[in-house]
Amino acid sequence: MTDQTTRLPIRRALISVSDKTGVVDFARELVALGVEILSTGGTYKLLRDNGISAVEVADYTGFPEMMDGRVKTLHPKVHGGILGRRDLDGAVMEQHGIKPIDLVAVNLYPFEATVVRPDCDLPTAIENIDIGGPTMVRSAAKNHKDVAIVVNAGDYAAVIESLKAGGLTYAQRFDLALKAFEHTSAYDGMIANYLGTIDQTRDTLGTADRGAFPRTFNSQFVKAQEMRYGENPHQSAAFYVEAKKGEASVSTAIQLQGKELSFNNVADTDAALECVKSFLKPACVIVKHANPCGVAVVPEDEGGIRKAYDLAYATDSESAFGGIIAFNRELDGETAKAIVERQFVEVIIAPKISAAAREVVAAKANVRLLECGEWPAERAPGWDFKRVNGGLLVQSRDIGMIKAEDLKIVTRRAPTEQEIHDLIFAWKVAKFVKSNAIVYARNRQTVGVGAGQMSRVNSARIAAIKAEHAGLEVKGAVMASDAFFPFRDGIDNAAKAGITAVIQPGGSMRDSEVIAAADEADIAMVFTGMRHFRH
């Protein structure tokens, strides 16, 4: 059994890195500890230029770099020194003049950064596929019993600290080996993703000839948290986040206080935050079971997020109990005080949490308080996944947005300026409501939300019931539908409720009947030409 605590001293290290962040200081520290450095190409030159003693691999092997650098480290004196088992292969190594290499610091050619360039063609991509690097990484990781592998510059300081304490323990070497295999796995996945999108029937194999979806889909996620249970107590669960961080999200958020996030907390917080990101002016979104139950937008000079919270809560105070609250502005102390005094809340998330707000929420120790950072106004493209038994559905993220100039007025009466503001607001909310989705809104406040019904007209009825239960007036409100109305009954019911304007995608075989129903009731209706199903 391997001794977990015995420290491995380092006498010889091979350093060959593409990302040279921190490598000069790392090598200097190694030399100060009496470590002999082997190096290649650009790394060797960088170390030499900084006065660090190193042996070029070509001099060590007696074999020059060749084929424009394609063959540098693929040599028995290198791989024998890395793979050699110190307790079994010592005699063979000595017979062939192979010296043990105790530490390998390698990271790989920037393949991903190369292939995202618009001018990158297939030959350029191929030349940026690293061969020697992954081979050394895998060799060192396989022989982690005797060799330390470092693929991340962020580990340099910890490695030096351990060496100063006498060497690296087996537990440290095992962890570094795991990181190495994760690194090469992600690297090979990038290559497979890229090559899998190439149209082999075309003569010019550049980025313009690439398809959207590769033959195999490779994406790496890192475990951020093991959870007490999943969606239900009998299910086990963990939260994994993308290895490469993107825009501000629930995955990048920092938890400032409160109980550990549950599986459902993460899912609901994601729904709330992604919805509130849709609005440029101060907004509040309250979510329950992944559905917005209250949303409001209030300009800064009219009360900002403090007023927006009041209005969002007023939409459905009953459902807001135990909900998730998201803001698109810094959470201030006054708004935080209003929340904790008024309701039980599971999670509050905002781009920034003020010191005053933190102090207020601290009195409620179980409330999970998350700070996610700012996000760009323009949403980044990406992928959405839905697991099915035996498969995975992959689609581009629904980042489609509409502006007033995108709307097609299809009724005799055009919507007023205020109705247009409310229609676009309601449309943004409907995008995040489970289909079939109906949203009633007035003055950029939801007054009723109907979610998840098999019949669109029943979702409209539920929205009306919600408004009545909250004591909010539907008359004079607008209505948004995430998909087209298949029959005129949805508009007829809206007219009876007092709806004055409707926004929907259009595209039904019976659009003319639906438009006629709106005209009969003097309802203004606009088509977006864009559907927002959410399942």
From Swiss-Prot:
Catalytic activity: (6R)-10-formyltetrahydrofolate + 5-amino-1-(5-phospho-beta-D-ribosyl)imidazole-4-carboxamide = 5-formamido-1-(5-phospho-D-ribosyl)imidazole-4-carboxamide + (6S)-5,6,7,8-tetrahydrofolate; IMP + H2O = 5-formamido-1-(5-phospho-D-ribosyl)imidazole-4-carboxamide
Pfam families referenced in this protein's UniProt entry, alphabetically: AICARFT_IMPCHas (PF01808), MGS (PF02142)
Record keywords: Hydrolase, Multifunctional enzyme, Purine biosynthesis, Transferase
Enzyme Commission number: 2.1.2.3, 3.5.4.10
Free-text domain note: The IMP cyclohydrolase activity resides in the N-terminal region.
Similarity annotation: Belongs to the PurH family.
Protein name per Swiss-Prot or TrEMBL: Bifunctional purine biosynthesis protein PurH
Species the sequence originates in: Pseudomonas aeruginosa (strain UCBPP-PA14)
The gene coding this protein: purH
